Amino acid sequence: MFTTPLPPQKRLSTQTEAIAKNITAIRSLDWDRDRFDIEFGLQNGTTYNSYLIQADKVALVDSSHEKFRQLYLDLLQGLIDPQRIDYLIVSHTEPDHSGLVKDILQLNPRITVVATKVALQFLDNFVHQPFERIQVKSGDRLDLGQGHDLEFVSAPNLHWPDTMLTYDPATEILFTCDVFGMHYCSDAVFDIDLGKIAPDYQFYYDCLMGPNARSVLAAMKRMDNLGTISTVANGHGPLLRHNVGELLHRYRHWSESQSKAEKTVVVFYVADYGYGDRLSQAIAKGITKTGVGVDMVDLSSADPQEIQELVGHASGVVLGMPPLQANADLSTNFGAVLAAMQPKQVFGLYESYGGDDEPIDPLRTKFLDLGLREAFKVIKVKDTPSESTYQLCDESGTDLGQNLIQAAKIKQLKSLDSDLEKAIGRISGGLYIITAQKGEVKGAMLASWVSQASFNPPGFTVAVAKDRAIESLMQVGDRFVLNILEEGNYQILMKHFLKRFPPGADRFAGVKTQTASNGSPILTDALAYLECEVASRMECSDHWIVYSQVTNGRVAKAEGLTAVHHRKVGNYY
């Protein structure tokens, strides 16, 4: 008898918590990662947070992902009769927060939706039915009674163009949706263990908010005019209460560092069309790894004058293909991009996979004819984006950024003190190749900055440049193999892995490998190997110091010696 195995059941649960007088958090806990979007790279699941404010008037702040439809709606109806809800505040219309808006409107057609102008436009296209609405902007208020006089703060591009924050002075709670969030699933409602959540908090920022650093600073400047913020009620992960000051400071510090970049790239996408927003985030993350600044702009809602100013001052432009049958505003903005492009700027193009993309090849030809430099091959998307697609986008962005800063790096190297660099160059280390695989994504890197750091458990550190492709595979919890090269028998492997690989290329083509128990490749010709797991990371200027614990290892040649890398100067590898 033949039976078809049932797909594994997703671990979904819900949770409620009274977080202040009259305010209840409704948390939808998604314990398993099932998306390839780049910000889910740490694979710690996520939560979708919604909030119910019950004063003289009742407001629901955001909803949940459609995968929680029955769980969420049953829980909501157990808390309150939906007919009593006066307002549905939509902070942002991405489906993971607004996936149940239509269901809530069906439960209570008289509810009034409160959102920004752009959010209401997106909702019209999503809901396809009339609904009561209030359009709000920064400084507008909504009085629910009993001191809950809500104030709204516009926060466009964090990370969608429609985002807004909501402040409740009665409880000193700031409702922020994606901002100050993290993809971290836990029963803990609040940020009790800062050390445990810190890597996820920064990774989420790097993926979604870092490419919008200027917008982050603009939003935080508006936040400065609010009252005391005692709790950040975010849309993903634990709420911030115990470490509010520290975690807000980190956002400000990271964003100030990003905004000081000497060179910038404008990354254009069309929100709510295909996978353009997700692909653009991956490209932007790759760019920011190199220290180049990014401005992310939604073509469907931007101002043409703003577009021309941004493009005019930028060193490069990345453009996602908009729909062929564009509306008038989108066509105007697309034309503004083309008109503002200048010779010698670098460019990159990618398909949005929205079903009606503008043809990409004629636009590439036009840019080349204008004298623009192509930073990476056009990214053509012929199927739902996979892990490999996002890796290609990330590495393409890194290539673009490295292209822009290459001349500045050479100039900086020449200006360094020669005696100092010669002295530092006398620090020697062994030769190793780090190999890693996570899902479909593989990576490798030649390394010499490796040092044992602990006996029990056995562990070591390795320095990884921020702009290395493998950096994204060496986050806390990731597994990899440290391949130790043999003296007198390392040249072939070293030469292979020193090559500059194009974005998305297979680093292991033509190399003999076997698979370690942790899933990463072992180089068959290595002297020895260690299977490792990343335990922690420390940021050090242009590198990450990655501390890893060893879980397994083997020596292939007992008499072999580790290859040693001797340098003469210390300003490059």
From Swiss-Prot:
Enzyme class: oxidoreductase
Pfam families (UniProt xref): Flavin_Reduct, Flavodoxin_1, ODP
Flavodoxin-like domain span: 265-401
Cofactor note: Binds 2 iron ions per monomer.
Region of interest: Flavodoxin-reductase-like: 424-573
Keyword entries, A-Z: Electron transport, FAD, Flavoprotein, FMN, Iron, Metal-binding, Oxidoreductase, Transport
Region entry Zinc metallo-hydrolase, spans: 43-236
Residues that, per the record, bind Fe cation 2: 96, 178, 236
Chain sites annotated for binding Fe cation 1: 92, 94, 159, 178
Cofactor(s) named in the record: Fe cation; FAD; FMN
GO function term, MF aspect, one: metal ion binding
Entry's EC annotation: 1.-.-.-
Keyword Magnesium: no
Gene3D superfamilies, alphabetized: 3.40.50.360, Electron Transport, Fmn-binding Protein, Chain A, Ribonuclease Z/Hydroxyacylglutathione hydrolase-like
Task performed by this protein: Mediates electron transfer from NADH to oxygen, reducing it to water. This modular protein has 3 redox cofactors, in other organisms the same activity requires 2 or 3 proteins.
Summary of subunit composition and partner proteins: Homodimer.
Family note: In the N-terminal section; belongs to the zinc metallo-hydrolase group 3 family.
Other information: By homology with NorV in E.coli, may be involved in nitric oxide detoxification.
Protein name in the entry: Diflavin flavoprotein A 1
UniProt gene name: dfa1
